[in-house]
Amino acid sequence: GSEMCIRDSIETVTLDVIPPVDGSIAACVTDEQKEANAKRLHEEDVIRNKYVGTFYTEEKAEALPKELGIDPLKTADFMIGSRGNWREIEKFLRDAPADKRPMAMDLLNVISAKDLRDTPASVLADHLNNAQAVQSSLFTEYILNPRVANEFLTPYRKFFAANVDSALVKKAKADPQLIVDWVKDNISINDSLNPQRIPIMPMGVWKSRVADKGSRDIFFVAVCRSIGIPARIEPVAGKVQYAKGLNWVDVDFEAAEQTVAKQGKVVASYQPIKALQDPKYY
């Protein structure tokens, strides 16, 4: 064992601390208990499999794209991937106006697998029906996409379209820095009010005008996307950015001016030698 001394102002006590011998603890289970547990596990499997049996299958997914005139392979992927949320995804596709069905498919394609499984049709419909169509290669991922970071998805797009001053929107499309300035002037930062850093919903930030830095960043991107400005939280360095043309501009809410993000290119080259086989990529 090892010795541990505890000292205080009165006395010193020496203890021998001996760890228990490593090993499993034998459990005494009767045959009746084993049988009851096996029965319970079987009942749980029956309940689970009955529920899973209601999910979409490839056969079931064939009818919907024929009815709506949408891509059958992608539709099958979405419906099967949505698991128990298939009713919401089906409702979203059925309710989408015919001229917006291609955009509806793009929206489902850009959200995560988890979002397919737990996002209500009403949230998806808000982002589809209130998205400002912009002719840009960045549109689907950085304007239409409702997902910014790890926030709870909410129907914020119609809200911001109605509440952000129209004069500001018009000017900001030409100069997105105006949205940066608005956020700096109107949103107070108080990280101590959200020690767990659970993202505040963008609409909540608008109403309270207070947020932690992470929620402020999500709010900024959500507002930009709602008014047709491509924006993101860059996934590698976590920088907040908006796009001006096809150039990404870093946002620093503490800086007076924003800087254009530097663009680079990584090239992997290989010179073969006889002593080694060529590398293979998986």
Positions of predicted regions on the chain:
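Short, small-residue-biased leader/transition segments that mark boundaries at the very start
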Residues: 1-6
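Extracellular beta-sheet/turn segments enriched in Thr/Pro/Gly and aliphatic residues
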Residues: 7-35
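An almost-null, non-specific background feature
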Residues: 8, 22-24, 133, 151-153, ...
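Secondary-structure boundary elements
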Residues: 35, 47-208, 253-255
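Long amphipathic alpha-helices with heptad-repeat character
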Residues: 40-44
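Hydrophobic/aromatic-rich core segments of domains that either
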Residues: 181, 193-280
